[in-house]
Design a protein with these regions (language model features):
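PG/GG-rich flexible active-site loop of Rossmann-like NAD(P)H-dependent oxidoreductases
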Residues: 40-43, 79-86, 129-131
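C-terminal helical subdomain
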Residues: 79-80, 95-135
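Amphipathic alpha-helical dimer-interface segment in Rossmann-like NAD(P)H-dependent oxidoreductases
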Residues: 13-33, 68
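Catalytic loop of short-chain dehydrogenase/reductase
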Residues: 34-58, 64, 68-71, 84
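Conserved active-site helix of classical SDR/Rossmann-fold NAD(P)-dependent CH-OH oxidoreductases
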Residues: 16-19, 56-64, 68, 75, ...
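Short-chain dehydrogenase/reductase
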Residues: 11, 15, 49-57, 99-100
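Short beta-loop-alpha junction of Rossmann-like oxidoreductase domains
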Residues: 48, 75, 79-93
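Catalytic Tyr-X3-Lys loop
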Residues: 3-19, 36, 59
Length: 135
């Protein structure tokens, strides 16, 4: 098992950072604004992901609570959970299977959240590679 400090660092990176950003900027948002949080399919599958999965599960819980908090203000909160994505980091580590999600796919889903009318919110989206996640 990882050390508690490793868990804390992961939570700070994947949950606390979002919490602090939202706390700082929420008062500046007008009705009809959007908040988009990037989770992970590792936060849905509780059987995998270790401390990363724990942190993304916690982010998912935060997104649900934040959505309820923001409803009366007319602010939409979306959680996007990508699966395995072909990023610059993966390109450098190895020539990964190109069946992973492209970052542009993730960008298109995020953009969609901002194209909706103020009366609609894309609450949660899970986007995975067609051939499945790579764990």
């Amino acid at each position: 098992q990882p050390e508690p400090e490793e868990l804390q660092a992961m939570l700070d990176s994947n949950v606390t950072a979002y919490y602090r950003l939202v706390k700082e900027f929420l008062p500046l948002l007008a009705p009809g604004s959007r908040i988009v949080l990037i989770g992970s399919t590792s936060g849905i599958r509780r059987d995998r992901g270790g401390i990363y999965g724990i942190s993304k599960w916690a982010l998912r819980s935060y997104a649900y609570a934040l959505r309820e908090e923001c409803k009366p203000m007319g602010i939409g909160v979306s959680l996007i959970n990508p699966g395995g994505t072909f990023t610059e980091t993966r390109k450098k580590s190895s020539e990964e299977d190109r069946s992973l999600l492209e970052t542009s796919d993730l960008g298109k889903v995020i953009a969609l959240t901002f194209r909706l009318s103020p009366q609609a919110v894309l609450e949660e989206v899970n986007i995975r590679p067609l051939k499945g996640d790579t764990y």
